[in-house]
Amino acid sequence: LKHRGSITPLDHDTLPDSTLNPIIEILLPVSGCAACCKLNYLLSMNFLKRILLLGTATALGLSAAQADHHLSVHYKGKAGPGKGKHVVLVSGDEEYRSEECLPMLGRILADHHGFDCTVLFSVNDKGEIDPNNQKSVTNSKAMASADLIIIALRFRNWPDEDMKHFVDAYHRGVPIIGLRTSTHAFQLRQGSYREFNSFGKKVLGEGWVSHWGGHKREGCRGVVEESNKSHPILMGATDIFADSDTYEAAPPADATILMRGLVTDSLKPDSKPVKGKQKKNRATGKVQDVNEPAMPVAWTRELKNPKGNTNRLFCTTMGAATDFKSEGLRRMIVNGVLWGLGMEDKIDGKADVTPIGEYNPTFYS
């Protein structure tokens, strides 16, 4: 597909049936689902997650190099407060299936709230979505026009030409939302941007410390920080449960803590807070009950960057694809987008965060 001399984003809303139908005919005998072949966010299906972009790239005659550079998903904003704003969602982690949840969130932001959304992926040299390829991010140039960026990254080792688009966006003051492992988003081994290995700690407000809860055994129940309960990001963000465990975190004094995460005794939504479990807090050097106090799991910062511009930053250590089965967590992210863009007056606690179609995320690895 050519558009003004370049490959168009793979957007099922803009692809005509004359283009979609041959692709569906190719994929339907294997996938068994015509709707899933329409390039929407059902990348979360294990089959489509691995072959959809590759199959589409092949059908369109793209080389592997072209696929790596161009393959991203674009959702055109419909009616809503975000009309005219561009949100770029960047996936790339080996554990928590950000390649599944970010398309779902992008579609919510576009369909329900009017934002134009572009989702970027990590792919391998065959053009398949492959979060294990730490050097890959598709269509990084999309960040050049971003009004806000959502990252769900872990130990990325991007080339300078890709890092430049992210760093330039950060320096011009673009609001950034960091999910889960984005506290340790980069592990750059060469190039001009290795100082961004500490982006989590220095900018978002925390780096990788430890699993405070038992990994794959203990869940996380969000509890609003009483002193900040009126913060707009928290409006309507209720009954949050994440089946990813609580991270150890100590945001800096200038951070506004919005929510803490009680360590629960199982991964079930009705699980109870653990009692009597103690661990050494690395920030304080003291042994404490894991829930007294509970660890911060969501906070904001407003920080001046080296170019003199101020970024609004929102970080949550929740964010596995399975965590986003929680309506409250989805609403907190939508609220975070509006807050990041200075649109607090558009937050009413009733944001529609219903996924478009099914959302059946894969459990994290």
Question: Where are the regions that the model predicts?
Answer:
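Hydrophobic h-region of N-terminal signal peptides that target proteins for export
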Residues: 57-65
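An acidic, glycine-rich "communication" segment
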Residues: 83-84, 179-278, 349-364
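Bacterial N-terminal signal peptides that target proteins for export
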Residues: 27, 33, 39-53
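Helical hinge/lid and interdomain linker segments adjacent to catalytic or ligand-binding clefts
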Residues: 68, 73-78, 88-90, 94-185
